[in-house]
Design a protein with these regions (language model features):
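Conserved NTPase motor "head" modules and their coupling/switch loops across ABC/AAA+ ATPases, GTPases
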Residues: 1-25, 39, 164-175, 179-288, ...
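Conserved lysine of the Walker
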Residues: 30
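Structural recognition of the conserved hydrophobic beta-strand(s) that form the central parallel beta-sheet
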Residues: 66, 315-322
């Protein structure tokens, strides 16, 4: 993997092994390195939508390039950003962001993984979307189509257009929206057994996960019609996939109300790793695990459980941690020391 002009990281070539521990102090570029690999494989950053902010301040451009070995035929992957344009290449041919998601599944554990339990519905929806982008080509198309329709309906509401003009978007919005919600709900059902198994392994307690649609009763089309006057008052669409959510419960109670930060992280990891298992079954591909701030908020016993899990999976792993962390001592692999330019 080679990096040129990516944030504050040095231009360099890195020969990655199966297990790679990125080590450095705060601000050394560990998260940026994970971001670079994620962007190379998926075409997008997990930190920002503003691609121009990733480029080196002097050159205003970057290139991330790598060779994916160990597959039937090695793939050369490249993402470049130049003159305000991002371009994706696979084996020297231009490709699309959607195809990159399908080709290179990633299991991302970022520094805010606790938000699976304690964050907003938007945080949780994003984790489902990332997983489905890797599995369902149709999902990205539906997601984009729904976003376009929602933007137009919300504009009509904000501009105080007539009820008829607002309602003109309801049919297409409901068609795309119901497909998105069905796929999300199906995904949660598919990971449920693995999630319950992982949460028992990590927490030693029974945990349940339940999907909640972003509208009540009947079809989305009916809900949009029923809520038109409410939406006109709010100047936005109040029901649909943008309101989807899921809840996690432990011992019959909502998890975020009565567990510690460490338990939150272990429960969130149970969810992320259950997604990993499901994605691998559905795609017949091993994910790459990117794990930021691996042992943050975890006691020694919990850290050992995570390390044992990572030792026993057949994945390429990149962890980001501090020089004196327990992980560096117990998870054998290549150590990459990082410093910003």
């Amino acid at each position: 993997m080679s990096l040129t002009g990516f944030r504050g990281l040095k231009n360099n070539i890195y020969d990655l092994e199966r297990v790679n521990n990125l080590v450095g102090e705060n601000g050394s570029g560990k998260t940026s390195f994970l971001e670079a690999l994620y962007l190379m494989c998926t075409g997008v950053s997990f930190l920002t939508k503003a691609t121009e902010t990733i480029a080196n301040h002097t050159t205003k451009q970057f290139v991330v390039e790598g060779i994916q070995a160990g597959t039937k035929d090695s793939n050369k992957i490249l993402v470049s950003y130049k003159q305000h344009k991002k371009t994706h290449f696979l084996n020297n041919k231009k490709t699309t962001q959607g195809k990159m998601f399908l080709k290179h599944p990633i299991c991302l554990v970022d520094a805010f993984v606790n938000r699976v339990v304690s964050g907003t519905p938007e945080n949780r929806r994003r984790t489902i979307d990332r997983a489905l982008f890797h599995v369902e080509q149709e999902y990205l198309m539906e997601h984009r189509a729904y976003a376009r329709c929602l933007k137009q309906r919300n504009k009509a509401l904000k501009d105080r257009q007539t009820t008829k003009q607002v309602g003109a978007w309801d049919e297409s919005l409901s068609i795309h929206g119901e497909k998105i919600t069905r796929m999300r709900e199906k995904h949660i059902l598919e990971i449920t057994a693995s999630f319950e198994e992982m949460s028992h392994l990590f927490l030693g307690r029974e945990a349940k996960i339940e999907f909640k649609r972003g509208w009540k009763g009947g079809s989305l089309f009916e809900a949009l019609k029923r809520n038109t006057e409410k939406d006109r008052a709010l100047k936005r669409t109040s029901c649909g996939p943008q309101r989807d959510d899921f809840t996690i419960g432990v011992g019959g109670k909502r998890a975020q109300t009565h567990i510690s930060h460490g338990q939150e992280k272990m429960l969130s990891l149970s969810y992320i790793f259950s997604q990993k298992t499901t994605i691998e079954k559905q795609t017949n591909k091993n994910t790459i695990i990117l794990f930021d701030e691996t042992d943050s908020n975890l006691d020694e016993a919990s850290t050992n459980k995570v390390i044992d899990y990572l030792k026993n999976v057949n994945n390429q792993i990149l962890t980001a941690t501090h020089p004196h962390s327990m992980l560096c001592k117990k998870l054998t692999g290549k150590t990459i020391f990082l410093k910003q330019n």
